[in-house]
Protein backbone atom coordinates (compact mmCIF):
# COMPACT_ATOMS: atom_id res chain seq x y z
CA UNK A 1 0.00 0.00 0.00
CA UNK A 2 1.37 3.38 -0.98
CA UNK A 3 1.09 6.57 1.10
CA UNK A 4 0.90 10.07 -0.32
CA UNK A 5 3.90 12.05 0.91
CA UNK A 6 3.18 15.28 -0.96
CA UNK A 7 1.48 16.02 -4.27
CA UNK A 8 2.83 13.44 -6.76
CA UNK A 9 5.24 11.78 -4.31
CA UNK A 10 4.23 8.41 -2.85
CA UNK A 11 5.92 6.21 -0.27
CA UNK A 12 6.21 2.68 -1.70
CA UNK A 13 8.51 1.20 0.92
CA UNK A 14 8.29 -1.70 3.32
CA UNK A 15 7.72 -1.88 7.07
CA UNK A 16 9.67 -4.49 8.99
CA UNK A 17 8.12 -5.02 12.41
CA UNK A 18 10.10 -8.18 13.12
CA UNK A 19 13.71 -7.19 12.44
CA UNK A 20 15.77 -7.15 15.64
CA UNK A 21 19.32 -7.20 14.29
CA UNK A 22 20.96 -4.82 11.85
CA UNK A 23 24.49 -4.76 10.42
CA UNK A 24 24.81 -8.39 11.39
CA UNK A 25 24.03 -8.38 15.10
CA UNK A 26 25.79 -5.09 15.85
CA UNK A 27 22.68 -2.91 16.05
CA UNK A 28 19.58 -4.03 17.93
CA UNK A 29 16.46 -2.73 16.23
CA UNK A 30 14.17 -3.14 19.22
CA UNK A 31 11.36 -1.16 17.55
CA UNK A 32 11.73 -2.66 14.09
CA UNK A 33 12.55 -0.56 11.05
CA UNK A 34 11.28 0.53 7.66
CA UNK A 35 12.88 0.63 4.24
CA UNK A 36 11.63 3.79 2.57
CA UNK A 37 11.28 3.93 -1.20
CA UNK A 38 9.60 6.83 -2.98
CA UNK A 39 7.83 7.07 -6.34
CA UNK A 40 7.64 10.51 -7.99
CA UNK A 41 5.12 10.91 -10.83
CA UNK A 42 5.70 13.97 -12.99
CA UNK A 43 6.25 14.09 -16.75
CA UNK A 44 8.98 11.63 -15.90
CA UNK A 45 8.45 8.91 -13.29
CA UNK A 46 11.26 8.45 -10.79
CA UNK A 47 11.84 5.72 -8.20
CA UNK A 48 14.11 6.73 -5.33
CA UNK A 49 15.75 3.70 -3.72
CA UNK A 50 14.24 0.25 -3.22
CA UNK A 51 13.97 -1.87 -0.05
CA UNK A 52 15.89 -4.57 1.79
CA UNK A 53 16.72 -7.57 -0.37
CA UNK A 54 14.58 -9.96 1.71
CA UNK A 55 11.47 -8.06 0.55
CA UNK A 56 12.49 -7.92 -3.13
CA UNK A 57 9.60 -9.89 -4.62
CA UNK A 58 7.00 -8.27 -2.40
CA UNK A 59 8.35 -4.83 -3.27
CA UNK A 60 8.23 -5.38 -7.03
CA UNK A 61 4.75 -6.89 -6.81
CA UNK A 62 3.46 -3.92 -4.80
CA UNK A 63 5.17 -1.50 -7.17
CA UNK A 64 3.31 -3.10 -10.10
CA UNK A 65 0.06 -2.18 -8.36
CA UNK A 66 1.15 1.47 -8.36
CA UNK A 67 2.64 1.85 -11.81
CA UNK A 68 3.41 -0.08 -14.96
CA UNK A 69 7.09 -0.87 -14.36
CA UNK A 70 7.88 0.04 -17.96
CA UNK A 71 6.71 3.58 -17.18
CA UNK A 72 9.50 4.14 -14.65
CA UNK A 73 11.86 6.52 -16.43
CA UNK A 74 14.64 6.83 -13.86
CA UNK A 75 15.88 5.05 -10.75
CA UNK A 76 17.85 7.04 -8.19
CA UNK A 77 19.99 5.10 -5.71
CA UNK A 78 21.08 7.34 -2.85
CA UNK A 79 22.93 4.48 -1.14
CA UNK A 80 24.00 1.05 -2.34
CA UNK A 81 23.69 -0.83 0.95
CA UNK A 82 21.38 -3.84 0.75
CA UNK A 83 18.67 -2.30 2.92
CA UNK A 84 18.36 0.50 0.32
CA UNK A 85 19.19 -1.10 -3.03
CA UNK A 86 18.49 -4.72 -2.16
CA UNK A 87 15.57 -5.16 -4.57
CA UNK A 88 17.45 -3.88 -7.63
CA UNK A 89 18.14 -7.31 -9.11
CA UNK A 90 14.45 -8.29 -8.94
CA UNK A 91 13.36 -4.93 -10.36
CA UNK A 92 15.96 -4.67 -13.11
CA UNK A 93 15.05 -8.14 -14.34
CA UNK A 94 11.77 -6.53 -15.43
CA UNK A 95 13.12 -3.19 -16.72
CA UNK A 96 16.80 -3.87 -17.52
CA UNK A 97 17.50 -0.71 -19.53
CA UNK A 98 16.14 1.81 -17.04
CA UNK A 99 18.78 4.47 -16.21
CA UNK A 100 20.18 4.32 -12.67
CA UNK A 101 21.48 7.60 -11.22
CA UNK A 102 24.03 7.29 -8.42
CA UNK A 103 27.54 8.32 -7.38
CA UNK A 104 30.66 6.77 -8.87
CA UNK A 105 31.36 4.95 -5.61
CA UNK A 106 27.84 3.53 -5.65
CA UNK A 107 28.48 1.76 -8.95
CA UNK A 108 31.30 -0.18 -7.35
CA UNK A 109 29.10 -1.11 -4.37
CA UNK A 110 26.07 -2.02 -6.48
CA UNK A 111 28.16 -4.24 -8.75
CA UNK A 112 29.77 -5.78 -5.70
CA UNK A 113 26.36 -6.80 -4.39
CA UNK A 114 24.41 -7.50 -7.59
CA UNK A 115 27.11 -8.30 -10.20
CA UNK A 116 25.44 -6.55 -13.14
CA UNK A 117 27.98 -4.16 -14.68
CA UNK A 118 25.83 -3.97 -17.82
CA UNK A 119 23.13 -1.93 -16.07
CA UNK A 120 22.61 1.60 -17.37
CA UNK A 121 24.53 3.55 -14.73
CA UNK A 122 24.69 7.35 -14.81
CA UNK A 123 27.18 9.03 -12.46
CA UNK A 124 26.09 12.21 -10.69
CA UNK A 125 28.02 14.68 -8.55
CA UNK A 126 27.08 17.49 -6.18
CA UNK A 127 25.13 20.15 -8.04
CA UNK A 128 24.12 17.93 -10.96
CA UNK A 129 20.44 18.13 -11.89
CA UNK A 130 17.88 15.93 -13.63
CA UNK A 131 14.79 17.49 -15.24
CA UNK A 132 11.66 15.45 -14.54
CA UNK A 133 9.14 17.80 -16.13
CA UNK A 134 6.38 20.08 -14.88
CA UNK A 135 9.03 22.63 -13.98
CA UNK A 136 10.69 20.32 -11.43
CA UNK A 137 14.23 19.06 -11.11
CA UNK A 138 16.17 16.65 -8.96
CA UNK A 139 19.35 18.14 -7.48
CA UNK A 140 22.01 15.70 -6.27
CA UNK A 141 24.32 16.26 -3.30
CA UNK A 142 27.13 13.83 -2.53
CA UNK A 143 27.49 13.00 1.19
CA UNK A 144 30.50 10.65 1.33
CA UNK A 145 30.97 8.80 4.64
CA UNK A 146 27.51 9.67 5.92
CA UNK A 147 27.83 6.83 6.38
CA UNK A 148 29.27 5.05 3.29
CA UNK A 149 31.57 6.45 0.56
CA UNK A 150 28.75 6.14 -2.00
CA UNK A 151 26.13 8.11 -0.04
CA UNK A 152 24.23 11.04 -1.52
CA UNK A 153 21.02 13.01 -1.00
CA UNK A 154 18.48 14.07 -3.61
CA UNK A 155 16.40 17.27 -3.52
CA UNK A 156 13.16 17.77 -5.44
CA UNK A 157 12.49 21.36 -6.47
CA UNK A 158 8.95 22.66 -6.50
CA UNK A 159 7.86 20.31 -3.71
CA UNK A 160 10.93 21.21 -1.61
CA UNK A 161 11.48 17.65 -0.40
CA UNK A 162 14.93 16.44 0.61
CA UNK A 163 15.42 12.69 0.22
CA UNK A 164 18.11 12.47 2.88
CA UNK A 165 19.25 8.85 2.73
CA UNK A 166 20.37 7.52 6.16
CA UNK A 167 20.90 10.97 7.65
CA UNK A 168 18.05 12.16 9.91
CA UNK A 169 16.56 8.65 9.96
CA UNK A 170 15.97 6.09 12.66
CA UNK A 171 15.29 2.38 12.93
CA UNK A 172 11.69 2.80 13.98
CA UNK A 173 8.60 1.07 12.64
CA UNK A 174 5.12 2.55 12.91
CA UNK A 175 1.95 2.34 10.86
CA UNK A 176 2.09 6.13 10.63
CA UNK A 177 4.63 7.69 8.28
CA UNK A 178 5.02 11.28 9.47
CA UNK A 179 6.91 12.60 12.49
CA UNK A 180 3.91 14.44 13.94
CA UNK A 181 1.84 11.23 13.97
CA UNK A 182 4.05 9.03 16.16
CA UNK A 183 5.06 8.83 19.82
CA UNK A 184 7.54 11.68 20.23
CA UNK A 185 9.50 10.11 23.10
CA UNK A 186 10.02 6.90 21.14
CA UNK A 187 10.92 8.82 18.00
CA UNK A 188 13.62 11.01 19.50
CA UNK A 189 15.07 8.13 21.54
CA UNK A 190 15.52 6.21 18.30
CA UNK A 191 16.94 9.26 16.49
CA UNK A 192 19.63 9.66 19.12
CA UNK A 193 20.32 5.91 19.29
CA UNK A 194 20.75 5.90 15.50
CA UNK A 195 23.14 8.84 15.51
CA UNK A 196 25.16 7.57 18.48
CA UNK A 197 25.68 4.06 17.11
CA UNK A 198 25.99 4.74 13.37
CA UNK A 199 26.94 8.34 12.61
CA UNK A 200 29.12 9.32 15.59
CA UNK A 201 32.40 8.37 13.83
CA UNK A 202 31.55 10.87 11.09
CA UNK A 203 30.55 13.79 13.32
CA UNK A 204 33.40 15.88 11.94
CA UNK A 205 31.78 15.59 8.51
CA UNK A 206 28.21 16.28 9.61
CA UNK A 207 28.51 20.01 10.29
CA UNK A 208 30.31 21.01 7.04
CA UNK A 209 28.00 18.84 4.95
CA UNK A 210 24.86 20.31 6.51
CA UNK A 211 26.36 23.77 6.07
CA UNK A 212 27.01 22.98 2.40
CA UNK A 213 23.42 21.84 1.88
CA UNK A 214 22.03 24.90 3.65
CA UNK A 215 24.30 27.00 1.44
CA UNK A 216 22.16 26.10 -1.58
CA UNK A 217 19.45 28.28 0.03
CA UNK A 218 16.76 25.81 -0.95
CA UNK A 219 13.53 25.66 1.04
CA UNK A 220 12.94 22.36 2.83
CA UNK A 221 9.28 21.53 3.46
CA UNK A 222 9.90 17.84 4.13
CA UNK A 223 12.79 15.49 4.83
CA UNK A 224 12.11 12.00 3.49
CA UNK A 225 14.52 9.58 5.14
CA UNK A 226 15.52 6.05 4.19
CA UNK A 227 14.43 4.60 7.56
CA UNK A 228 11.68 5.64 9.94
CA UNK A 229 9.52 8.73 9.68
CA UNK A 230 9.18 11.46 7.09
CA UNK A 231 9.77 14.83 8.75
CA UNK A 232 6.95 17.16 7.70
CA UNK A 233 6.24 19.06 10.95
CA UNK A 234 9.14 21.46 11.53
CA UNK A 235 11.49 19.26 9.47
CA UNK A 236 14.61 21.24 10.30
CA UNK A 237 14.33 20.32 13.99
CA UNK A 238 16.21 17.11 13.29
CA UNK A 239 18.85 19.06 11.34
CA UNK A 240 19.36 21.29 14.38
CA UNK A 241 19.72 18.22 16.60
CA UNK A 242 22.36 16.77 14.25
CA UNK A 243 24.36 19.99 14.45
CA UNK A 244 24.13 19.82 18.24
CA UNK A 245 25.11 16.14 18.41
CA UNK A 246 28.02 16.67 16.01
CA UNK A 247 29.56 19.37 18.22
CA UNK A 248 31.37 17.14 20.77
CA UNK A 249 28.05 16.50 22.48
CA UNK A 250 27.78 15.75 26.19
CA UNK A 251 25.24 16.01 28.98
CA UNK A 252 25.77 16.17 32.73
CA UNK A 253 25.72 12.38 32.82
CA UNK A 254 28.12 9.60 33.80
CA UNK A 255 27.82 6.07 32.46
CA UNK A 256 29.23 3.10 34.37
CA UNK A 257 29.40 -0.28 32.69
CA UNK A 258 31.15 -3.44 33.78
CA UNK A 259 31.42 -7.20 33.53
CA UNK A 260 31.99 -9.38 36.54
CA UNK A 261 32.76 -13.00 37.39
CA UNK A 262 31.79 -13.15 41.08
CA UNK A 263 29.88 -9.89 41.60
CA UNK A 264 32.96 -8.22 43.09
CA UNK A 265 33.25 -5.68 40.28
CA UNK A 266 29.50 -5.07 40.51
CA UNK A 267 29.93 -4.16 44.18
CA UNK A 268 32.61 -1.67 43.15
CA UNK A 269 30.37 -0.15 40.48
CA UNK A 270 27.50 0.33 42.93
CA UNK A 271 29.77 1.94 45.53
CA UNK A 272 31.39 4.26 42.98
CA UNK A 273 27.94 5.36 41.82
CA UNK A 274 26.93 6.08 45.42
CA UNK A 275 29.99 8.29 45.87
CA UNK A 276 29.26 10.22 42.69
CA UNK A 277 25.60 10.77 43.56
CA UNK A 278 26.24 11.98 47.10
CA UNK A 279 28.87 14.48 45.91
CA UNK A 280 27.03 15.77 42.84
CA UNK A 281 23.29 15.13 43.12
CA UNK A 282 22.67 16.92 39.82
CA UNK A 283 24.56 14.45 37.65
CA UNK A 284 22.68 11.55 36.06
CA UNK A 285 24.41 8.22 36.76
CA UNK A 286 23.53 5.07 34.82
CA UNK A 287 24.96 1.59 35.52
CA UNK A 288 24.99 -1.32 33.08
CA UNK A 289 26.13 -4.92 33.37
CA UNK A 290 27.26 -5.62 29.80
CA UNK A 291 26.27 -9.28 30.07
CA UNK A 292 22.65 -8.31 30.75
CA UNK A 293 22.20 -5.02 28.92
CA UNK A 294 21.51 -3.85 25.39
CA UNK A 295 24.89 -2.90 23.98
CA UNK A 296 23.49 -0.10 21.82
CA UNK A 297 21.75 1.44 24.83
CA UNK A 298 25.10 1.46 26.64
CA UNK A 299 26.81 3.16 23.69
CA UNK A 300 24.01 5.71 23.42
CA UNK A 301 24.49 6.55 27.09
CA UNK A 302 28.25 6.88 26.56
CA UNK A 303 27.52 9.27 23.69
CA UNK A 304 25.35 11.36 25.99
CA UNK A 305 27.83 11.32 28.90
CA UNK A 306 30.64 13.63 29.95
CA UNK A 307 32.51 10.59 31.23
CA UNK A 308 32.45 6.82 31.51
CA UNK A 309 33.72 4.39 34.13
CA UNK A 310 34.47 0.93 32.80
CA UNK A 311 34.88 -2.04 35.13
CA UNK A 312 36.22 -5.53 34.55
CA UNK A 313 37.29 -8.54 36.51
CA UNK A 314 40.70 -9.93 35.62
CA UNK A 315 40.62 -13.22 33.73
CA UNK A 316 43.88 -14.78 32.54
CA UNK A 317 45.49 -11.41 33.28
CA UNK A 318 43.30 -9.64 30.70
CA UNK A 319 39.89 -7.95 30.72
CA UNK A 320 36.61 -9.79 30.27
CA UNK A 321 35.81 -10.46 26.58
CA UNK A 322 32.56 -8.47 26.49
CA UNK A 323 34.35 -5.44 27.92
CA UNK A 324 37.17 -5.79 25.39
CA UNK A 325 34.64 -5.96 22.57
CA UNK A 326 32.69 -2.93 23.75
CA UNK A 327 35.84 -0.85 24.19
CA UNK A 328 36.84 -1.82 20.65
CA UNK A 329 33.47 -0.54 19.44
CA UNK A 330 33.98 2.72 21.33
CA UNK A 331 37.34 3.06 19.62
CA UNK A 332 35.62 2.79 16.23
CA UNK A 333 32.90 5.25 17.21
CA UNK A 334 35.58 7.85 18.04
CA UNK A 335 33.76 9.62 20.86
CA UNK A 336 35.09 13.09 21.64
CA UNK A 337 35.08 15.41 24.64
CA UNK A 338 34.73 12.58 27.17
CA UNK A 339 36.65 11.38 30.20
CA UNK A 340 37.14 7.84 31.43
CA UNK A 341 38.31 5.78 34.37
CA UNK A 342 38.92 2.04 34.66
CA UNK A 343 38.22 -0.10 37.71
CA UNK A 344 37.96 -3.75 38.61
CA UNK A 345 38.57 -6.60 40.99
CA UNK A 346 41.18 -9.33 40.79
CA UNK A 347 42.67 -12.22 42.70
CA UNK A 348 46.35 -13.04 42.46
CA UNK A 349 46.91 -10.84 39.40
CA UNK A 350 45.31 -7.53 38.41
CA UNK A 351 46.47 -6.85 34.87
CA UNK A 352 43.04 -6.21 33.36
CA UNK A 353 42.54 -2.71 34.76
CA UNK A 354 45.90 -1.51 33.44
CA UNK A 355 45.16 -2.92 29.98
CA UNK A 356 41.71 -1.38 30.08
CA UNK A 357 43.12 2.05 30.97
CA UNK A 358 45.50 1.86 28.01
CA UNK A 359 42.72 0.83 25.64
CA UNK A 360 40.45 3.66 26.80
CA UNK A 361 43.24 6.17 26.32
CA UNK A 362 43.89 4.78 22.84
CA UNK A 363 40.17 5.24 22.13
CA UNK A 364 40.54 8.98 22.71
CA UNK A 365 39.24 9.36 26.25
CA UNK A 366 40.88 11.74 28.72
CA UNK A 367 41.89 9.40 31.52
CA UNK A 368 41.41 9.77 35.26
CA UNK A 369 42.90 7.54 37.94
CA UNK A 370 41.95 3.87 37.89
CA UNK A 371 40.90 1.76 40.88
CA UNK A 372 41.57 -1.87 41.80
CA UNK A 373 40.23 -4.13 44.53
CA UNK A 374 41.69 -7.50 45.49
CA UNK A 375 39.21 -10.34 45.90
CA UNK A 376 35.79 -9.47 47.32
CA UNK A 377 35.78 -5.86 48.53
CA UNK A 378 35.16 -5.52 52.25
CA UNK A 379 33.60 -2.47 53.86
CA UNK A 380 36.89 -0.59 53.84
CA UNK A 381 37.42 -1.35 50.15
CA UNK A 382 33.87 -0.30 49.33
CA UNK A 383 34.44 2.97 51.15
CA UNK A 384 37.50 3.50 48.94
CA UNK A 385 35.21 2.94 45.95
CA UNK A 386 32.77 5.54 47.26
CA UNK A 387 35.63 7.97 47.76
CA UNK A 388 36.78 7.24 44.22
CA UNK A 389 33.28 8.15 43.05
CA UNK A 390 33.37 11.36 45.08
CA UNK A 391 36.68 12.34 43.52
CA UNK A 392 35.41 11.52 40.02
CA UNK A 393 32.36 13.72 40.67
CA UNK A 394 34.61 16.59 41.72
CA UNK A 395 37.03 16.19 38.80
CA UNK A 396 34.32 15.81 36.16
CA UNK A 397 31.92 18.48 37.46
CA UNK A 398 30.63 20.81 34.74
CA UNK A 399 29.71 23.51 37.26
CA UNK A 400 30.61 24.35 40.87
CA UNK A 401 29.24 21.63 43.13
CA UNK A 402 26.72 22.34 45.87
CA UNK A 403 28.26 22.31 49.32
CA UNK A 404 28.13 18.74 50.56
CA UNK A 405 26.42 18.00 53.85
CA UNK A 406 27.36 14.34 53.85
CA UNK A 407 30.29 14.62 56.23
CA UNK A 408 28.38 16.94 58.57
CA UNK A 409 25.44 14.58 58.73
CA UNK A 410 27.67 11.62 59.44
CA UNK A 411 29.46 13.47 62.21
CA UNK A 412 26.20 14.60 63.80
CA UNK A 413 24.79 11.10 63.66
CA UNK A 414 27.97 9.66 65.07
CA UNK A 415 27.97 12.05 68.00
CA UNK A 416 24.36 11.24 68.78
CA UNK A 417 24.42 7.53 68.12
CA UNK A 418 27.48 5.34 68.53
CA UNK A 419 28.12 2.23 66.48
CA UNK A 420 27.52 0.16 69.59
CA UNK A 421 24.04 1.68 69.92
CA UNK A 422 23.17 0.34 66.46
CA UNK A 423 23.87 -3.23 67.41
CA UNK A 424 26.25 -5.75 65.89
CA UNK A 425 27.18 -6.20 62.25
CA UNK A 426 25.58 -9.23 60.64
CA UNK A 427 27.24 -11.68 58.25
CA UNK A 428 25.61 -13.82 55.57
CA UNK A 429 26.44 -17.43 56.45
CA UNK A 430 26.38 -18.39 52.76
CA UNK A 431 28.51 -15.78 50.96
CA UNK A 432 30.05 -13.94 53.95
CA UNK A 433 28.69 -10.52 52.96
CA UNK A 434 28.54 -8.22 55.99
CA UNK A 435 25.71 -5.87 56.87
CA UNK A 436 27.01 -2.82 58.74
CA UNK A 437 24.21 -0.88 60.52
CA UNK A 438 26.27 2.31 60.33
CA UNK A 439 26.27 2.14 56.50
CA UNK A 440 22.98 0.42 55.82
CA UNK A 441 22.28 -0.86 52.32
CA UNK A 442 21.19 2.11 50.14
CA UNK A 443 20.53 -0.09 47.13
CA UNK A 444 17.59 -1.58 49.07
CA UNK A 445 16.58 1.72 50.68
CA UNK A 446 18.02 0.73 54.05
CA UNK A 447 19.38 4.01 55.36
CA UNK A 448 22.70 4.36 57.22
CA UNK A 449 22.11 4.00 60.95
CA UNK A 450 19.52 1.22 60.62
CA UNK A 451 20.04 -1.57 63.20
CA UNK A 452 19.55 -5.12 61.99
CA UNK A 453 16.35 -5.45 64.01
CA UNK A 454 14.78 -2.68 61.92
CA UNK A 455 15.87 -3.99 58.53
CA UNK A 456 12.73 -5.03 56.57
CA UNK A 457 11.90 -8.73 56.53
CA UNK A 458 12.03 -8.75 52.72
CA UNK A 459 15.72 -7.73 52.76
CA UNK A 460 17.94 -9.87 50.51
CA UNK A 461 21.67 -10.35 50.69
CA UNK A 462 23.12 -8.18 47.86
CA UNK A 463 25.53 -10.97 46.94
CA UNK A 464 23.61 -14.25 47.06
CA UNK A 465 20.03 -12.93 47.18
CA UNK A 466 19.08 -14.97 50.24
CA UNK A 467 16.92 -13.60 53.04
CA UNK A 468 17.54 -12.38 56.57
CA UNK A 469 17.30 -15.86 58.05
CA UNK A 470 20.78 -16.81 56.74
CA UNK A 471 22.47 -13.91 58.57
CA UNK A 472 24.36 -14.39 61.81
CA UNK A 473 26.02 -11.99 64.18
CA UNK A 474 29.58 -11.34 63.05
CA UNK A 475 31.80 -13.70 65.04
CA UNK A 476 34.26 -10.99 66.07
CA UNK A 477 31.41 -9.05 67.70
CA UNK A 478 29.58 -11.92 69.37
CA UNK A 479 29.49 -11.58 73.15
Curated annotation (Swiss-Prot):
Coiled-coil ranges from the UniProt annotation? none
Binding, Fe cation 2? 83, 166, 227
Q: Where is this region: Zinc metallo-hydrolase?
A: 30-210
Phosphoprotein is among the record's keywords: no
A single Gene Ontology MF term assigned here is:
nitric oxide reductase activity
Compartment annotation: Cytoplasm
Pathway(s) it belongs to: Nitrogen metabolism; nitric oxide reduction
Main localization of the protein described in the UniProt heading: cytoplasm
> Where is each Flavodoxin-like domain found?
254-393
Q: Which residue range or ranges hold the Rubredoxin-like domain?
A: 423-474
The UniProt annotation places FMN binding at 260-264, 342-369
- What does this protein's record comment on cofactor binding? Binds 3 Fe cations per monomer.
Q: Which domain of life is it from?
A: Bacteria
Q: Give cofactor(s), names only.
A: Fe cation; FMN
Q: Gene3D superfamilies, alphabetically?
A: 2.20.28.10, 3.40.50.360, Ribonuclease Z/Hydroxyacylglutathione hydrolase-like (3.60.15.10)
InterPro entries reported for this sequence? Anaer_NO_rdtase_flvorubredoxin, Flavodoxin/NO_synth, Flavoprotein-like_sf, Metallo-B-lactamas, ODP_dom, RibonucZ/Hydroxyglut_hydro, Rubredoxin-like_dom, Rubredoxin-O_OxRdtase
| Electron transport among keywords | yes
Q: Which PROSITE patterns match?
A: FLAVODOXIN_LIKE, RUBREDOXIN_LIKE
- Show the GO cellular component annotation of the record: cytoplasm
Q: Which UniProt keywords apply?
A: Cytoplasm, Electron transport, Flavoprotein, FMN, Iron, Metal-binding, Oxidoreductase, Transport
Binding-site positions, Fe cation 1: 79, 81, 147, 166
A Pfam family this chain is assigned to: Rubredoxin
**Which family does the record assign?**
In the N-terminal section; belongs to the zinc metallo-hydrolase group 3 family.
The job of this chain, per UniProt, is described as: Anaerobic nitric oxide reductase; uses NADH to detoxify nitric oxide (NO), protecting several 4Fe-4S NO-sensitive enzymes. Has at least 2 reductase partners, only one of which (NorW, flavorubredoxin reductase) has been identified. NO probably binds to the di-iron center; electrons enter from the NorW at rubredoxin and are transferred sequentially to the FMN center and the di-iron center. Also able to function as an aerobic oxygen reductase.
What name goes with this protein?
A: Anaerobic nitric oxide reductase flavorubredoxin
Q: Which gene encodes it?
A: norV
